[in-house]
């Protein structure tokens, strides 16, 4: 494991056959596991939703530290943060925030992009406060048991 710190440069990189196993090894803390699907499940889901799934590994310098996936529906001009996870060893270092800033810049380049949506399961340990700090606000809508939030771009 490489040494990473708050000063590490965050980048989004393609998931390839060379880094796939490293991405599969990333895990959230046990108490967070019911809030986000595993990276294996996310990548499998992306395979079946190829037309809209855009996913990347989150790197801090040369170390894979997380994963994100976007529902990138340019036809409908709908952009939804589908997955976001940072490995438990690398949480609280600002990597998720930096990765989302990169994602915001990417989504701004997409056709008709005016906002980014996200959803979360409420409860202790949920990412609600994290998303609020990044400017997401509740839409008043639900998707199943998940609360939907939006952030203007």
Range-by-range predicted roles:
Residues 63, 87-101, 122-129, 133:
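Conserved glycine-rich acetyl-CoA-binding loop
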Residues 2-3, 143-153:
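Terminal substrate-recognition subdomain of acyl/acetyltransferases
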Residues 107-119:
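Conserved GNAT acetyl-CoA-binding A-motif
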Residues 6-82, 87-89, 100, 106, ...:
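Acetyl-CoA-dependent GNAT
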Residues 117-128, 144-146:
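Conserved beta-strand-loop-alpha-helix junction that forms the acyl-donor binding cleft
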